[in-house]
Amino acid sequence: MKNTNVIRSAYDALAESYNRWIDHKPHNAYYDRPNTLKLLDDVGGKSILDAGCGPGKYAEILMSKGASVTGFDFSPEMIKHAKERNKNKGTFFVHDFSTPLTMIADQSFDFVLCALALHYVEDWNDTLREFHRVLKDQGQLIISIEHPFFEYTYFKSTDYFKIEAVKCTWKGFGFPVEINSYRRSLHECIKPLTENGFYIDKLVEPKPVRAFEALDPKHYKELNEFPAFLCIRAVRK
């Protein structure tokens, strides 16, 4: 990732408040997680790689359902919180998406989960090839990303088809933090999957669950009219 250090610094700065808010922050707790988790089949007894695990909330949920979880994130502070949250359960380590997962053997996992993280990677191809390598035959890759149509509108882009470095300021974690990521077209979300050994099994334009409304009625209404995220289940060929 060209912006790795910038993104890492932002998430290191956010880590404490992000971890504190993640259980009930509406876009995470009542929009992303319920819709993304629906794409995972029964995880009891299964092995899951949580790629871009943040403070380990997904890992906490999945391990409570009987899964074995290994998580990585490029933010050392996020990994510290993931370990603290999950105590002695699971395995967590610092790793950059843009480098190979040399510490993981071929066909090690039943699932790879990558929730709201791939949009920090400019070129998905190497990352998806690694996900394909570490998945078992017919293993599933579950991803959630910012919806390309939402991003195109939000960032007021002029060339929809361009993979474009973008940035915005997050203000929902107690203090403003500039977040850098990459916007891309729907085609550029699907093509790297189908060209790197996956087929698309399910694609969801999610709506928030009802608990979102009491906490943020404005965005609840907006998200029921136009999606901000996109959830995809892809299967290893």
What are these regions (language model features)?
Residues 1-44, 57, 61, 78-81, 141-169, ...:
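Conserved class I S-adenosyl-L-methionine
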Residues 125-140:
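A short glycine-rich, Lys/Arg-flanked "PGG" loop and its adjoining helix->strand segment in the class I
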Residues 111-124:
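A short SAM/SAH-binding and catalytic strip from SAM-dependent methyltransferases
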